[in-house]
Amino acid sequence: SILAAMAILGLVDTLIPLLAERFGLWQFHATRSALVLAALLAGAAALGWRLRPRRWRGVAARSVMIAAAMTVYFACLASFSIAQAVAGLFSAPVWVVLVTALVLRRRVGAVAWAAAAAGFAGVLMSLGFLGGGAEVSAAALLPMAAGLFYGVGQIGTREWCAGEGPMTLLFGFFLVIGVVACAGLALVSLLPEAVRLEAPAQAGFVLRGWQAPDATFAAVVAAQAAGSLVGVGLIVRGYQLAEASFVSVFEYTLLLFASLWAWALFGQGVTAAQGAGIALILASAALAARFGTAQRPAPAA
């Protein structure tokens, strides 16, 4: 079920560039959040899902971190290849180790440091900083910002949200990112039209306001909403059926599935350096899981 979840999430994330030229990031997040929140409320009414958190502050803080991560991640999908965006997101375990050791002042074993270093090298290779050959700008580090926020959110899941159910966390995340998206729409509407029109194509995805939806927008957003719900459900089921340290490794196959979907749908390949980077990230995840130091990456919502 984990592999099926990663295949679904990889597919729906690959569709984002279809929206980037005509629609905006904030419109996408606001619409998707509305659909998912409606589905969660319907599920709570029909199936008894618990959406109310036991610890409001913890769930709110965690939701803010994950919302920040997903805002940066989806913005990157319009400017970077899918492999680069996902690799940046999966720098989260590196940040988890650093924050745990340097901020929380907790002991981190040598294997965890080695796995984090290998994963970090893999991310840098995927982003073109190692072995790419071509000149790379500092902007290529942006996907790693998503990983930083995601890593803090992972720590928050464990430290602040113990005992909270997956539907509660999902509801909190989509509620927060929906509010952020509405605020984003309001802010970009205040920008002079000349600024929005003269922005580069990639920046336009972030600066663009509300546009009249069409069939493509509706299809992509519906697929994203359904994919988020089904993907999370399959992941939860996978963790119920097998040992967490074993299952967590398979979540990193999102890198493979996203790259395969990008190649199949848009002919977007990966370089040799990016392929080696992806392999190194997967190897670091397996190493961490083998010695009980894995940090579950959690689904890209």
Which residues does each PLM region occupy?
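Hydrophobic/small/kink-forming positions within alpha-helical transmembrane segments
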Residues: 6-11, 41, 63, 67-71, ...
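Helix-helix packing/entry segments at the starts of transmembrane helices
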Residues: 86-91, 160-176, 229-263
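Transmembrane alpha-helical segments that form core, pore/gating elements
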Residues: 17, 40, 133-196, 211, ...
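Transmembrane alpha-helices of multi-pass small-molecule transport proteins
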Residues: 22-68, 148-156, 172-189
